[in-house]
Regions:
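A short local loop/turn or secondary-structure capping micro-motif enriched for an aromatic residue
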Residues: 85-88, 96-97, 271-275, 347-349
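Gram-positive cell-envelope targeting signals
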Residues: 1, 362-363
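Extracytoplasmic/periplasmic membrane-proximal domains and adjacent transmembrane bundles
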Residues: 357-359
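Short, non-transmembrane alpha-helical segments in secretory-pathway proteins
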Residues: 193-230, 276-317
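Short helix-loop boundary/capping segments
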Residues: 258-285
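Exposed beta-strand-loop-beta-strand "reactive/processing" segments of non-cytosolic proteins
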Residues: 145-191, 216-261, 266-267, 307-336
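Conserved histidines in hydrophobic membrane contexts and catalytic metal-binding motifs
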Residues: 208, 254, 326-334, 339-354, ...
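Preferential activation on post-signal-peptide N-terminal prodomains/segments
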Residues: 1-200
């Protein structure tokens, strides 16, 4: 569906100015719950500037995270879960008939209700699900591949620290830290030092895409996943579901500051899918999960997002075989963790730290 939408939205041209038509929660939720719209949702806000053909303005930093596809090919609606705003755009050149057909004939359909959390509306699964467990053979690009792509092949120096990590440098401004080859770790950190202002939202998104392409992670379905302040993150998606690494790590995370750009990434490549063997994982209704977290001390109003993602699990039958286990992941206090991890945390320490931050901000 996402590929079909992307293909058609690239053809769309706005034939009039963007018009705000909704700015209240009540009206916004009427659109959310209207079955006549096909909704495509970004995991976090993006800006109008990324869709110049829809507004003819390269510096429009208004944000949205949700497309509403109506029954007409002449109108499209852009929604912002945070502000309850919906914008109407009259368009020409796009045909979403196939998209509507795909949505109508989808093989997997689960009843959900949309619940407002701290960062917007999350789909809450109403019934227990038996979600498929997938398996993949994985591999990793060599460190020399990333050194060559990110630093080049000449003028590069290296220095190994006592932890076995090696830092490759190109002049004083660009570095790549690679893991110890004997550690079994595959986490890299690329740093480019540059005095600059932290870019605005649009440029952070565009710059992060540039660095993702620079990495050259092969055969991946990397997608935009999250944006917090100066950070923009990406995850690999399999069967439309995000894959978390090392319990809760993101595959690529770009961080912008006034003196550098950092790109932390993992080199894992989910290369060969293993035929589905019928294994499933039982997932509770989402509200039951939230109730468990509340009983553990994590208030619902502190939950930013909740999704179903894949957790990695090594298969004992082969050193490169990974099982992808469907698991609830929850974002709270700006941290992503699985349900099991949050249930083991002393949530009061997070709450106290969060309150301290709020108090300091109010001084």
């Amino acid at each position: 569906m996402t590929l079909e939408f992307t293909k058609e939205i690239k053809k769309a041209k706005a034939t009039n100015k963007i018009k705000k038509i909704v700015d209240t929660r009540t009206k916004y939720e009427e659109y959310l719950n209207n079955p006549n719209y096909v909704q495509l949702v970004y995991p976090d806000e993006i800006t109008f500037s990324l869709f110049n053909q829809l507004n003819n303005a390269a510096n429009d930093n208004r944000e949205f995270n949700r497309f509403f596809i109506s029954q007409s090919n002449h109108w499209i609606y852009l929604g912002n879960d945070q502000t309850n705003e919906i914008y109407q755009v009259k368009i020409a050149g796009a045909n979403f008939d196939k998209l509507r057909k795909y949505a109508c004939n989808a093989k997997s359909k689960y009843p959900v209700r949309l619940v407002r959390l701290k960062e917007g509306y999350s789909p809450f699964y109403i019934k227990t699900m038996n979600a498929k467990v997938y398996s993949y053979l994985t591999n990793h690009q060599s460190y020399s591949y990333f050194v060559s792509r990110l630093l080049g092949t000449s003028g590069v120096t290296s220095k190994t620290n006592k932890n076995g990590q090696t830092v490759y440098s190109l002049n004083y401004y660009t570095r790549l830290r690679v893991p110890d080859s004997n550690s079994g770790e595959h986490n890299y950190l690329y740093t480019h030092y540059e005095k600059n202002k932290i870019p605005n939202t649009t440029n952070r998104l565009l710059d992060s895409v540039y660095y993702v392409h620079q990495l050259g992670l092969t055969e991946q379905d990397l997608r935009f996943f999250d944006a917090d302040g100066a950070n923009v993150s990406y995850l690999n998606y399999i069967e439309g579901i995000p894959v978390f690494l090392n319990k809760h790590d993101l595959q690529v995370k770009t961080t912008f500051s006034t003196d550098s750009i950092n790109v932390a990434f993992n080199s894992v490549n989910f290369q060969i899918p293993i035929p589905f063997d019928g294994q499933t994982k039982r997932l509770k209704p989402t509200q039951d999960v939230v109730d468990e977290l509340v009983n553990h001390g994590l208030k619902q109003e502190d939950i930013q997002r909740i999704i179903v993602g894949f957790a990695e699990e090594k298969d004992s039958s082969h050193h490169s075989l990974i099982n992808l286990i469907p698991t609830y992941y929850i974002k709270a206090y700006d941290e992503w963790k699985s349900l099991g991890e949050w249930e083991k945390q002393d949530v009061s320490t997070y709450r106290e730290a969060d309150q301290l931050t709020v108090n300091e901000g109010g001084k």
